[in-house]
Structure formats: C-alpha cells, structure tokens
C-alpha cells in the first residue's frame, strides 16, 4: 500500500489550508500541523456549544454505519404556544446518540464561534477559495459512514482529539460527477493511515475514503472543504439570485434588463476582488451569507 506520510510540518492550520489551495495536490497526503487553541475542538468544547444552545438541528446530523438518525432522536420536546420546535436540540438526546455509537457531524461552527469565524475570514481571503468547516465527533471503535467520495476540490482533515484510522481507495473514475454515488470497491484500497492529534490528511476531489475511530477514546476532527470559485461561477450565482428575487409579474424586458445590468456591473469590476468578497462573505459579521446571493 502507498505511504501517505510526508515530512512536511505546517506552522498553523491557516498555512495548511492556504498551501493546499495554492498547490492543488493531485494525490492524498498526510503531514503534521500545529493546532492552536482556537482550532482545538474537543468533545468538551462541543459540550459547551451544546449546553449553550448554540447548535441547532439545522447545523448537525448523526450517522452510524451510514444510517442517519431521525430528527425525533435529537430534537427537544420544548413547546411554544402548544407547538413543538423541532429545530431545538435536546442535549440529553444528543449525548445518548453519541453514547450509542452515532457520529455527530456539525456544520458551520463559525456561525456561533467567534474565534473560528475570525480565522475562517482570514484564511478565505488568503487562499481566495471558499471554505466549508465541519466537526466530526465519533465514539471509540465506531464508524459513521461507509466508503464514499466527496465533491469538494479538497477535503483537509485535522485531528484534534483521539485517533482515527483512514482508508484511502482509488482516484475518481473517468467521467465521475458529484451525482454519481457509486462507492469505491473494497479491493481498490490503496493506503491506510492513523491520524493522531496534530496529524492532517489532504484528500483531493472524488478520491475514495472511509474512516473509523480507534478504540482508545472518542475521536474529534475538523474537516475543511476547500473549493475554488471561478469568476464565471460567481456571475452565474448572482444572476440566479437576481432572477429569483424578481416579482412574478416581471416582464421579459425587465428580466433582460436585470441580466444585462449584472453582466455590465461584473465586467466593470475587478473579478479577483469580487471572488474575495464572495468567499469571505459568510464570515463577515452582518454581511449576506452565500445562500442569500
């Protein structure tokens, strides 16, 4: 099997992400990285978020052996005017799910964690690429997901607590797209590596992989999805957003005028600056998030 470990040591997670975005590696590789306190996400820190009511059902999911937990197993029984609010989490239910072997997946912790948000803002501006941050908390000796491929240009894994065993398979087959859910074959395994705290693994788009926590304790890792954004994609996103916001009574002439105005504005602006504004928007307090564009 391939040896994924390199002698590279990154001084910070920011350096790791920026280097990945700029060099665009073509094969998986493992290295070491210094994890600052701001990025040191552990089960205890997740408990703090949970007890503070900062995590909602919109930003978390649970999976055990590739089977998702239903909303009823995590949502609070809290009622307002006689109606349940399912987006509120029950801390007790969440802990029972994890204790029973479910992996907890948190998306976008920058929404409530100011330290992570400030770091993400700095990193996205430096690498000129979008960033999707997730936290995976996996009970010892368990696996949340089966073999699969991710659509991000790069997935950058950083182990922050415990240990996790990663199995790498093959590169995406010719013609692979994000809509192809065909799983890598077991015989296609090409490498295996155990990540301890401070280890990192970079997985290029579509490369087959699977992971499971080691038996010694809970595993927590950060997963950063890094995606390059072209000026053309930015223009398409802006056009779609503008068309969606138009009134149903808008005429064909109104639609054509809105389209031409956007194209003219885009051509007059500096494309690189527009991309930087786009990728950093989710982490600037008070600005529109990407979904609002």
Model-inferred region functions:
Residues 78-137:
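Hydrophobic alpha-helical hairpins/lids featuring a short glycine-rich hinge
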Residues 1-15, 22-27, 182-194, 210-293:
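Fe(II)/2-oxoglutarate
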Residues 136-140, 151-172:
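Short, conserved beta-strand element in jelly-roll/cupin
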Residues 145, 154-155, 191:
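Short, conserved secondary-structure segments in the cores of folded domains
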Residues 163-197:
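A short beta-strand-loop-beta hairpin characteristic of the jelly-roll/cupin
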Residues 1-62, 66-69:
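An N-terminal JmjN-like helical accessory module and its immediate linker preceding a catalytic domain
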Residues 160, 193-212:
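Conserved metal-binding segment of the jelly-roll/cupin
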């Amino acid at each position: 099997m391939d040896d994924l470990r390199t002698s590279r040591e990154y001084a910070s997670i920011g350096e790791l992400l920026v280097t990945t975005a700029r060099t665009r590696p073509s094969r998986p590789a493992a290295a070491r990285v210094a994890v600052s306190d701001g990025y040191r996400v552990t089960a205890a820190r997740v408990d703090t978020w949970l007890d503070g009511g900062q995590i909602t059902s919109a930003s978390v999911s649970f999976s055990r052996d590739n089977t998702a937990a239903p909303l009823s197993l995590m949502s609070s029984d809290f009622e307002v005017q006689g109606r349940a609010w399912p987006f509120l989490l029950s801390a007790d239910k969440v802990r029972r799910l994890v204790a029973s072997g479910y992996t907890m997946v948190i998306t976008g912790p920058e929404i409530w964690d100011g330290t992570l948000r400030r770091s993400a803002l700095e990193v996205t501006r430096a690498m000129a690429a979008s960033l999707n941050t997730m936290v995976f908390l996996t009970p010892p000796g368990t696996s949340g997901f089966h073999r699969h491929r991710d659509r991000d240009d790069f997935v950058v894994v950083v182990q922050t607590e415990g240990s996790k065993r990663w199995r790498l398979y093959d590169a995406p087959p010719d013609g692979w797209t994000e809509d192809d859910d065909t799983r890598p074959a077991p015989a296609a395994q090409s490498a295996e590596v155990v990540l301890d705290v401070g280890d990192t693994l970079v997985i290029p788009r579509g490369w087959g992989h699977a992971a499971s926590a080691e038996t010694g304790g809970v595993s927590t890792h950060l997963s950063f999805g890094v995606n390059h954004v072209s000026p053309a994609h930015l223009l398409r996103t802006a056009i779609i957003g503008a068309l969606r916001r138009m009134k149903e009574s808008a005429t064909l002439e109104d639609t054509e005028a809105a389209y031409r105005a956007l194209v003219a504005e885009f051509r007059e602006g500096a494309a690189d600056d527009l991309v930087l504004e786009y990728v950093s928007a989710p982490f600037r307090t008070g600005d529109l998030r990407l979904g609002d564009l």
